[in-house]
């Protein structure tokens, strides 16, 4: 890897200050995508901003009709949450199917949606569950957030703070996982609401 400066701020204000002062900085949470990318020299940020210790980014809140999950909440925390298991059990099951125990203990929901891997699980859950992504600058609907392969609507110095999911009447997620990585070779998330049924697909290309 290339040389870089490592920063570990304690507040969002400190994060924004470092971002504004360092044009080639990258956010580090679980590091499950960024660190391997850096090891392969496909990314060379001048500064790594570790947000894993910022408490205001790690939470799961029941708001009645919605559930809000902080960006640094790990996959294991999602699958273990009584709130999620009771209100959106399909989301807990989705998290349980991600990677191996190491990935689930380190990887975060915010990191996953910010990376927007076309074979990742959370993006289709966000779409089917009418999610709203809150950043340090604004709120974005899931439909507008996911732009293309590995591409989102996040602007320069903009980071994900939390994701708010609507609670469906019922929902289910099924995928055909890669035997090694457990990424979805094809996956479908279906959610039923009063106003209709939402279906989102991950991992499947146009040509099959």
PLM features: what roles do these ranges have?
Residues 1-208:
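C-terminal structural segment of proteins
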């Amino acid at each position: 890897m290339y040389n870089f400066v490592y920063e570990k701020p304690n507040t969002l204000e400190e994060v924004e200050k470092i971002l504004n002062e360092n044009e080639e900085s990258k956010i580090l949470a679980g590091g499950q995508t960024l660190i391997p990318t850096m090891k392969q020299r496909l990314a060379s940020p001048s500064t790594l901003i570790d947000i894993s210790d910022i408490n205001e980014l790690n939470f799961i809140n029941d708001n009645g009709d919605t559930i809000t999950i902080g960006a640094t909440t790990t996959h294991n925390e999602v699958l273990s949450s009584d709130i999620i298991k009771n209100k959106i059990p399909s989301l807990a099951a989705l998290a349980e199917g991600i990677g191996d125990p190491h990935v689930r203990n380190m990887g975060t929901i915010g990191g996953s949606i910010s990376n927007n891997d076309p074979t990742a699980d959370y993006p289709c859950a966000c779409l089917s569950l009418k999610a709203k992504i809150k950043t340090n600058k604004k709120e974005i609907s899931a439909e507008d957030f996911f732009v293309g392969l590995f591409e989102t609507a996040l602007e320069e110095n903009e980071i994900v703070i939390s994701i708010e999911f609507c609670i469906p009447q019922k929902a289910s997620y099924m995928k055909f996982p890669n035997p090694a990585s457990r990424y979805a070779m094809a996956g479908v998330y279906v959610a039923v609401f009063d106003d209709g049924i939402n279906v989102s697909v991950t991992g499947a290309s146009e040509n099959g």
